[in-house]
């Protein structure tokens, strides 16, 4: 009996609609499609006889979770995680699909929500700092051996915008776009000179980019 009463109380709480700003926490689950690219490098003669000068990531399905807390009616802070189920390609004198790669992103973020908290539609944007992990890839070498590449984690930022939609309850929907550039390396970019600091070598940074179009469900507490 006590268990049933507890469940009933939870359901009543979730179905209730307190004042908009009283619902400060949001949890979202999202799915989408991510457009990805890799980076270029110096030509490398591989054991298969081909020359490769770029690694690329395939566009693919992605999903994620995020949790935010509204510190004011417009400002939100939180953490987000995302995963893209991609494949790693080598490009050069031929295109070679190396294997499956999982790309995981981890970012703390600050967001801004437009309009009042009880509005049906609330446009938003956010900016985050964190890291992107490129998972290991299992592949077969030209000699028929099973090999595995190492995983790599690099600093990344993330930027996003979209709209949240609520129908008056605790459950809503969201749709938006998110761009995540991940720093990979810097190539020599030449020399820069000025009359005060002298001359120094500058780099040309390369980023692996992910552009996600997605949507999902929001639970507001």
Where are these regions (language model features)?
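Predominantly the C-terminal beta-signal and adjacent terminal strand-loop region
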Residues: 40, 51, 86, 168-221
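Outer-membrane beta-barrel translocator domains and adjoining extracellular loop/strand segments
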Residues: 39-48, 89-95, 135-145, 185-193
